[in-house]
Amino acid sequence: MYDNPQGLIAGSVIMWVVTTLCVGMRFSQKLRDRQRFFASDWLIVAAWIFGTGLTILEIYGVAIKSLGYKIGAAILDPTAITGQLNKAKHIQLAFLLLGIAGIDLVKLSVCFLYWQLFAKAHTKLRRFLIVWITLIALWGTSFVLAGLLECGSHLTAVFGTPTEYLKHCGSAVPSGYAMVATDFAADFVTLIIPIPVVLGLHIDTRKKILTLLIFLIGALSVASSITKGYIYIRSSMGMYTEDALIILTGISMWNLAEVQIGIIAACGPLLRPVLIRAFSPLTTLIASKWRSSSQVARHPKENQELPSHSDMPGSEVDLAKQSTLSEAKAGAQ
């Protein structure tokens, strides 16, 4: 799967094009609606820059035959220590550092989006987000430092013999396990943050389902972090048997995929006009089953109509206002 240079380049370019389109549409939508740019927007641009860097690295690695090709030896085999493998290790270290930073920027962008949408109306959520944003920032910083210092003061041991690597870099694999586990946990928590808020909105059921589905696009990011974790764990267990370059290629490719998929997922809530048209038939079906009781009998015509674009919370401002109104009504009751 990973010894296909043309496929790796094509996949990298396609993901970059899709993320570029998503970020471009996000900004053009804001300019068209004359909305302000917030921290969440600039953070996603920073993540896109890191994603672009990872794409260039992937293509460069394939071009110099350090990624996407077989070397014929396992990563801990003394015969595998060649210039080709060392170049791949340099690329892999850059992938690790840029990948963690890019993923962290995506998470922070999503958290700041929640802040601008919901924090004003929800005091408890505001307090939680302050803590959560701090933890996410510390998560990224700590694992970037862990990547830089995985061999302590013997950084060159990463590119040395297996004996040197095992002697000086013993914490690298446990640190990697901790990173992929906490990455998944952070993605999952970030994904479910808006669910109680959206369920509490005083809007039509179909609108509520549609809004929820748009936020749950973030499940793509959770799925990619699970996949990357699986690839990392499987690769670390196969260091004695699997081809060295294939292991590094697989890890680098899923590092890139997680960042790019995260950017796409983070742009989802701000591309509601496009996604509304895509999800409307599905939400109509779900809502009709959800409310197939007395409400259907009393309002048959209402349930037969698809939600129009003007009826939906189609912008950040509308959704923030809807959240504020719902919280005010709940407080009044």
Predicted features along the sequence, with ranges:
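Extracytosolic/lumenal membrane-interface segments
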Residues: 1-320
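Fungal low-complexity intrinsically disordered segments enriched in serine/threonine and acidic residues
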Residues: 314-333
